[in-house]
Amino acid sequence: SFDPVEYVNPLMGTQSSYELSTGNTYPAIARPWGMNFWTPQTGKMGDGWQYVYTANKIRGFKQTHQPSPWINDYGQFAIMPVVGKPEFDQDKRASWFSHKGEIAKAYYYKVYLAEHDVVTELTPTDRAAMFRFTFPENEHSYIVVDALDKGSYIKVIPEENKIIGYSTKNSGGVPDNFKNYFVIEFDKPFTYEATFADASLKEGTKEQTSDHVGAVIGFKTKKGEIVHAKVASSFISFDQAAINMKELGNDNFDTLVQKGKDVWNEHLSKIEVEGGDLDQYRTFYSCFYRSLLFPRKFYEINAQGEVVHYSPYNGEVLPGYMFTDTGFWDTFRSLFPFLNLMFPSVNKEMQEGLINTYKESGFFPEWALSLIHISEP
């Protein structure tokens, strides 16, 4: 059977730097036009080059909304397993990794973290994701949730095996009430709870708000023990994040991986190419995958099944579609005609979102980052 997603290489274009781009990409593990992407993070917090192929350490697994390194990210937070000590600092918790121990697909990511002897796997839906951690035998296994800097909140709820929090990190131009609310549920009870604010870890303190906060939860693990984490987020509220978590349903990890693969194949199989060699197939479908990431969905489905969105223009929750993170002065030439041709029903939703942008801001965008409206006279 035709399996075009297996030609996609999300690592293509990641050997880039500020000085020299070979694509300025990161491995966006995502669904087509998903509200949230996930990426392994090799760069320091706030670095636009968040994953670089030549790096040898991973600092965390980050929910990201970044369209380019120049525009940078917003609402991001990171998750990282560690063993031994509850290290939360981004440098101290980082682990060596090798590309030989890494699998990157559009719909699935797996890596062996050598320093911690932990295998991390993740698979996303539009607004949620599931992690599968395989731990070694250790009295002190931990998972760090880093809500990052520029204003964040964290709360550990051990009786529900849950962590909630929000990030207000952004690149400017946001309404005062901007937050990315996240909810994380684990399938193993905690035997250790701590939160950190800035550079200080407080064991037993379950809630913190500061410039840079996060949480560390821990437990004893057996060799090969698997711990799952369900993650969802919302730009509207914690309650909406819990609704978005329902995208995962009762599916297990492997079922979600297969569903993600099926969705990508459904979209990518709209074009079947002939002739050429394997490298050309990989190039074509990797670029096709990149063409189906942005503009991303910035809308959510509420408890009544209605399409709603947090407006990055006036801070209100309003009905209707919203898409973002695309530079129209680049994408009007080819991307939008292509989407109109190949995915007219999705392009219609994007155009409705453009009308909503005009209603809420008074302008059509030229470079629409959800939180920044860039327009030139």
Give the positions of each predicted feature:
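Accessory carbohydrate-recognition regions in carbohydrate-active enzymes
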Residues: S1-F336, N340-L371, S375
